[in-house]
Amino acid sequence: MGRFAATLVGSLFGLGLLLCGLGRLASAEPRAPPEKIAIVGAGIGGTSSAYYLRKKFGKDVKIDVFEREEIGGRLATLKVQGHDYEAGGSVIHPLNLHMKRFVKELGLSSVPASGGLVGVYNGKSLVFEESSWFIINVIKLVWRYGFQSLRMHMWVEDLLDKFMRIYRYQSHDYAFSSVEKLMYAIGGDDYVRLLNQTLRENLKKAGFSETFLNEMIAPVMKVNFGQSTDLNAFVGAVSMTAADSNLWAVEGGNKVVCSGLLQASNSNLISGSVMSIEKTRTKQTGTPPKMYEVVYKTGSEIHSDFYDIVLVAAPLNRKMSNITFRNFDPPIEEFNDPYQQLVTTLIKGELNSTLFSSRHKDQFGLSAILVTDDSDMFINSLSIVASVSHKEGPPPAVDGMHVWKTFSKDILTKEQISKLFLSYDYAVRKPWLSYPYYNPPQKCPSIILHDRLYYLNGIEFAASCMEMSAIAGYNAALLAYHRWNGNEDMIDQDDLYEKLKTEL
């Protein structure tokens, strides 16, 4: 959720999810496509699944996308004095090729993520300050941490080199029926184990020091996922890719990708809240019956419609979606896994730099401040941000004032804001349930809830970010397509990596 310099974790250059292109059709002869598909949720997962379902099933299927709030879901913006700023998913890695492809095919433009120098604060002083000189940063890191930053680079690179396999599988139209099977196909038991072990446990076994974990790793976890090193090791590795120096965003806000995908898929948007999904009791006839009835509310009116396939692309936590499943035998599992509250606050003000450093404010050059694990600060991070339409990064300060973004667990009080800023003109906040609470061992919710009922957001319990949601959307579309057409040989295949190497 922010741009963090690569030097915070040493030589973490060029890390990311390496993605392949999209590929061939399944070999089995497809039957007639379904008539109607419902997708619940118009975030990146829901709209990307609509996009890929259209590509797989063709032009004749009707796709309804339900959204009770705004298109984009947690890719939301906040307005400060007439300008929009990212409040949710903010940055995209240069090798997130799903997102890059969307931007290219939809005719959108990219902008560099907000840059600047970063510091790490322990509640008393800055334990690390980034320099504009690369060699100075290297000396600082080696002096304080030895070669642990280089070893961290190698650890993350090894994990993500394996993760790239999922994109080769998807480029050949292979799908997976569970998150665990997807993870196993990528890297075997060692990869699945990442979900069941904390990042701290993993890195301590690898020989990383407490000082390095507290000052270099925990701050990145806190700003990206609101937790420390107690989250699972896989989401920890994904989080570390935010140390890349070439992060970008979509001009106009990342949420415009969702509206673009919705339009490109020729889907029908229904602005309403889905109340229940019921398995129908329709008797079998010559044509496949509509298997599910979706009951939804628009304004004060309640409606319903029938669908062949339903994809749920919204968290099924009761505090977030509150969808009731009726007439399923066995019953659909309950989804009680908690999501974390995150409060995004945008403040236009003059930073109280003496809170972090004894230097005069004119000599305080940091644009972002992260906090260590043992800090008693009431925020997770603080950074200067640019509006979604500003191509050149944050504009120069006016009367010493910038627009700053903070992440915190609780709503900031006026006293807390006044502690952070010498003065401020404006503050706007958005509290929301932003991502799962990671508590390994991590069991991911099922993807297949019923014969033609699919759940995308279980992948968030492996890691939550835009690209993971796009991967989940593509996987769900492939899974629905293959199961509709009986292409069992395209689902959960063993030894795919070796098989595809042989094909090449």
From Swiss-Prot:
One of its GO terms (molecular function) is FAD binding. It is an enzyme of class 1 (oxidoreductase). It comes from the Eukaryota. GO terms for biological process: chloride transmembrane transport; prenylated protein catabolic process; prenylcysteine catabolic process. GO terms for cellular component: lysosome; very-low-density lipoprotein particle. Pfam families: NAD_binding_8, Prenylcys_lyase. Expressed mainly in cerebrum. Its cofactor is FAD. Residues 1-28 form the signal peptide. It is found in: Lysosome. It catalyses: an S-polyprenyl-L-cysteine + O2 + H2O = a polyprenal + L-cysteine + H2O2; S-(2E,6E)-farnesyl-L-cysteine + O2 + H2O = (2E,6E)-farnesal + L-cysteine + H2O2; [(2E,6E,10E)-geranylgeranyl]-L-cysteine + O2 + H2O = (2E,6E,10E)-geranylgeranial + L-cysteine + H2O2. Glycans are attached at N196, N322, N352. Its EC number is 1.8.3.5. Keywords: FAD, Flavoprotein, Glycoprotein, Lysosome, Oxidoreductase, Signal. Prenylcysteine oxidase that cleaves the thioether bond of prenyl-L-cysteines, such as farnesylcysteine and geranylgeranylcysteine. Only active against free prenylcysteines and not prenylcysteine residues within prenylated proteins or peptides. Involved in the final step in the degradation of prenylated proteins, by degrading prenylcysteines after the protein has been degraded. Belongs to the prenylcysteine oxidase family. This is Prenylcysteine oxidase 1. It comes from Rattus norvegicus.
